[in-house]
């Protein structure tokens, strides 16, 4: 019999998880394996495996302890959001994307995915039962499943299956790639992942790495892992930032009071749909030239128009939204190439006044500079200040996730032959998540919203007004 009965870390992890599900907890103590069981006794087969694989299991425990780091506040929020006790909860934070490609070489794609897995520890992340993150050293070769794509129904079925998939935080992997093959040359690549391992910027990096490698391009992998970056990262208390937010929340308006079909606590099935708009390359260029002329940032302009549009439909003229920050501290020269979850969040507000739109944008831009200044301050603390002891409530459920680079090029902004055709996200305690990006060579705006909360025509009308308001800015100013 082989010296090793487990082939890799995931085999051991699955074995231990099966025992835990049966009420048996296993841990290492020096050179001994200890256990606690509801039935007090272990089955003979379990005892046999523990005896034969003692060395492997003890090494596994040491590896997990060696690689352990605390979860970030956002990762912790995602874990909590999976529980049914949270308003708009009982779901994971999840992202799903579909691509089409001609003449896909699945074997080559699979090889490149495995290379990227080996180079990025975030793709080997698990959550321990003690509520920490750890990273597996030795995972099995990831095989990309292939299914036959006979018609649109097969693709739609796969989309339904994967677009809201719920991962087990204690198991590997927390991502999934699969391919639908047609009788012709066209294939569909389905990609989804739990956001506890990757933020939106990292997801973009991941796919760029895989696609670049697939086409034979050189990829420079970071010389620092996500784990080691997090160990270098410091979040020292910032008294100035704390005082700023304590004062700010005193007069901060609440989230947009739109025409919600249900109270948040009444929503049992949290499922999202997406509405989106692609601006042309010419429109995007025109918009960015206007922004440049006023010395604004694209994020300030788009977020202000977003808030102004929501204010037109809100019961109250003032409102606040949750802003996603991609907070990479410059602790290493390769920091921008690391895959992982770097997200922090903060809040910006809008007050409907007689001031011009330009003045409103200036006010937003000033707030955003403050967000940059105090970017190390944990957004979870801001939400705690706002919650006033309302545990489990969705405090700031409208989110602005900005991935704008502020310039576009037809030449450099293409993702090879992989054409993105569909995407959707979901996040616990979020009712509306606005994603805005320009990495495809044009401005793309999308809203992911909870189906049971919004009437479809109502949310479509608001979105249409938003698109028109962006176009008015292009033409009027």
Where do the model's predicted regions map?
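Active-site-proximal acidic secondary-structure segment that organizes catalysis
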Residues: 47, 58, 68-70, 180-226, ...
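A short, small/polar-residue-rich loop/turn motif at beta-strand boundaries
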Residues: 2-13, 104-118, 135-172, 242, ...
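N-terminal beta-alpha "docking/capping" segments at the starts of catalytic domains
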Residues: 62-103, 161, 196-197, 209-212, ...
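Extended, hydrophobic beta-loop-alpha segments that form or line the acyl/peptidyl-thioester binding
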Residues: 120, 124, 207-208, 317-324, ...
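Acyl-thioester-dependent condensation/acyltransferase catalytic cores
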Residues: 12-14, 83, 117-191, 198-201, ...
């Amino acid at each position: 019999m082989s010296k090793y009965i487990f082939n890799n870390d995931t085999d051991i992890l699955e074995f231990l998880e099966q025992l835990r599900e049966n009420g048996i907890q296993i841990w290492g103590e020096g050179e001994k394996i200890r256990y606690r069981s509801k039935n007090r006794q272990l089955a003979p087969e379990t005892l046999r495996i523990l005896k034969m694989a003692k060395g492997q299991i003890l090494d596994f425990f040491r590896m997990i302890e060696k690689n352990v780091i605390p979860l970030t506040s956002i990762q912790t929020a995602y874990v909590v959001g999976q529980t049914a006790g949270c308003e708009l909860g009982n779901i994971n934070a999840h992202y799903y994307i579909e691509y089409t490609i001609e003449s896909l070489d699945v074997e080559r794609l699979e090889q490149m995915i495995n290379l990227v897995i080996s180079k990025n520890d975030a793709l080997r992340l698990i959550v321990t039962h003690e509520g920490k993150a750890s990273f597996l050293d030795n995972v099995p070769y990831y095989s990309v499943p292939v299914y036959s794509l006979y018609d649109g129904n097969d693709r739609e079925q796969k989309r339904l299956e994967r677009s809201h998939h719920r991962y087990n935080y204690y198991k590997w992997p927390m991502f999934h790639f699969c391919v639908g093959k047609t009788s012709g040359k066209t294939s569909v690549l389905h990609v989804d992942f739990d956001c506890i391992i990757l933020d939106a910027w990292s997801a973009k990096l991941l796919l760029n790495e895989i696609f670049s490698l697939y086409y034979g391009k050189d990829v420079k992998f970071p010389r620092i892992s996500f784990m080691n970056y997090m160990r270098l990262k410091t979040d020292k208390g910032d008294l100035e930032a704390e005082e700023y937010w304590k004062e700010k929340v005193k007069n901060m308006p609440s989230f947009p009071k739109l025409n919600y079909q249900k109270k948040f606590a009444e929503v049992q099935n949290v499922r999202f749909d997406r509405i989106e708009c692609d601006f042309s390359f010419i429109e995007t260029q025109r918009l960015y030239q206007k922004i440049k002329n006023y010395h604004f940032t694209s994020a300030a302009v788009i977020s202000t128009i977003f808030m102004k549009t929501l204010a037109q439909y809100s019961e109250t003229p003032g409102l606040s939204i949750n802003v996603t920050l991609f907070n990479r501290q410059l602790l290493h020269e390769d920091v921008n190439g690391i895959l992982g979850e770097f997200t922090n969040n903060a809040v910006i507000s809008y007050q409907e006044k007689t001031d011009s739109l330009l003045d409103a944008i200036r006010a937003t831009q000033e707030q955003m500079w403050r967000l940059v200044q105090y970017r190390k301050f944990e957004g979870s603390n801001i939400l705690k200040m706002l919650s006033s002891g309302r545990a489990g409530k969705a405090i700031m459920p409208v989110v602005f996730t900005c991935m704008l680079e502020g310039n576009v090029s037809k030449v450099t902004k293409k993702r090879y032959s992989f054409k993105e055709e569909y995407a959707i996200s979901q996040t616990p305690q979020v009712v509306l998540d606005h994603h805005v990006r320009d990495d495809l060579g044009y401005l793309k705006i999308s809203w992911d919203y909870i189906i049971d909360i919004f009437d479809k025509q109502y949310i479509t009308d608001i979105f249409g007004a938003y698109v028109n308001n962006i176009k008015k800015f292009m033409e009027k100013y």
